Amino acid sequence: MTSFAIYVLAALAEIAGCFGFWAWLRLGKSPAWAVLGVLSLVIFALLLTRIEAGAAGRAFAAYGGVYIIASLAWMQVVEGARPDRWDLIGGVICLAGAALILFGPRTN
């Protein structure tokens, strides 16, 4: 599986996990949502360990850009709130930064 695919799956797992707690604590849903949230967050953490990177911090930093784009997509698809142009511009800037971190030339 490619790094990008792992990042996308990790983002969906993290967002779903956090949303489980949001649904429980903010939307008054059943505590079962929190249990699902915990399971999803465990999957998220396991997925990030599959990234090929020389340092954990680099893998996590690059993931941040993908997380932001996935969060904006979640906002529109799941919550029905359309991202505005500033959301989209910010997301593109963050994704460009993530690409530099992940794919930039390295000197040893």
Curated annotation (Swiss-Prot):
One of its GO terms (cellular component) is plasma membrane. The chain crosses the membrane at residues 4-24, 27-47, 59-79, 85-105. Pfam families: UPF0060. Keywords: Cell inner membrane, Cell membrane, Membrane, Transmembrane, Transmembrane helix. It is found in: Cell inner membrane. It is a multi-pass membrane protein. Belongs to the UPF0060 family. HAMAP family: UPF0060. PANTHER family: UPF0060 MEMBRANE PROTEIN YNFA (PTHR36116:SF1). This is UPF0060 membrane protein CCNA_02055. It comes from Caulobacter vibrioides (strain NA1000 / CB15N).
